Design a protein with these regions (language model features):
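Glycine-rich phosphate/diphosphate-binding loop of Rossmann-like nucleotide-binding domains
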Residues: 1-29, 159-197, 208-209
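Short, ordered loop/turn segments at secondary-structure junctions
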Residues: 13-17, 79-80, 104-107, 126-127, ...
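Phosphate/nucleotide-donor binding subsite
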Residues: 22-68
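Short glycine-rich or small-residue beta-strand-to-loop segments that form or flank ligand, phosphate
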Residues: 41-50, 62, 71-78, 162-169
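Cap/lid and interdomain-hinge subdomains that line or gate substrate/regulatory clefts
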Residues: 42-43, 109-171
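Short, acidic/small-residue loops that bind anionic groups at enzyme active sites
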Residues: 73, 85-114, 123, 191-195
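Short glycine/serine/threonine-rich phosphate/pyrophosphate-binding segments
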Residues: 80-88, 109-111, 172-177, 200-201
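Glycine-rich, charge-decorated loop segments at or immediately adjacent to ligand/cofactor-binding or catalytic sites
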Residues: 107-116, 201-207
């Protein structure tokens, strides 16, 4: 379906057994990225161990592949195991890179999967196990959404101004708005984060990433 839209499909095998079709990146390469041997992982017959090992490999390998220009967006389908395996790799990618996770876990608390990143979570409605009339529609919608994100980039001109972070509650909105106007008049760009939920964590992630100047 991806290729029928005129896009390229770059596949990564995250399972521990033989794939259903030849992937672009084999599970041996994924495992090796974190110092594991795929034969040893498969030989244990331990789902939790395999998930953790392959997740570590994905977290290290996926950002490297992105830097090499192998893909422009990442799309994955999974249940609880697949979601916990792939989302750490998604979180390791820069903000702005399209990331879409179709998951059985998407209708609940997804903070452990999304963290401070911009992962989009889409409920799979039915289990991610084969194709049926419902899953085919959901999976197709996910492909179309990803195709749109990688095909249509924002044309807005980005001005590289020094970034200043501010946190805000509803009751402090007038104060922060006034401070924002003051700083922007002096050549700064102000990023406002909600002071509850993941807002503060997102701000700290950008600070740790070296984006924030004050």
């Amino acid at each position: 379906l991806i290729e029928s839209l005129g896009l390229g499909a770059f596949t990564v095998h995250t399972g521990v057994y033989e794939p259903a079709f030849p992937p672009d990146v084999g599970n041996d390469e994924v495992a090796a990225a974190a110092g594991y041997d795929i034969g040893e992982i498969a030989g244990r017959h331990d789902r939790a161990y395999a998930t953790e090992a392959m997740s570590e490999g994905m977290e290290k390998l996926i950002p490297r592949l992105y830097e090499q220009g192998k893909f422009d967006g990442i799309l994955s389908f999974g249940g609880s195991g697949g979601t916990s395996l792939v989302t750490p790799a998604m979180r390791a990618l820069p903000i702005g890179v399209p990331k879409l996770m179709v998951s059985t876990m998407a209708s609940g608390n997804v903070s452990q999967y999304v963290g401070t990143s911009d992962i989009l979570m889409m409920p799979s409605i039915v289990d991610v196990s084969g194709l049926n009339s419902f899953s085919t529609k959901i999976f197709s919608n996910a492909v179309f959404a990803m195709a749109g994100m990688v095909s249509f980039e924002s044309k807005q001109q980005i001005e590289h101004k020094p970034l200043v972070a501010a946190t805000m509650f509803g009751v402090t909105t007038p104060c922060i708005t006034r401070a924002q106007e003051y700083l922007e008049q002096r050549g700064y760009e102000v990023l406002v984060f909600h002071a509850t939920g993941a807002g503060g964590q997102s701000m700290e992630a950008l600070i740790n990433g070296g984006f924030i100047k004050g």
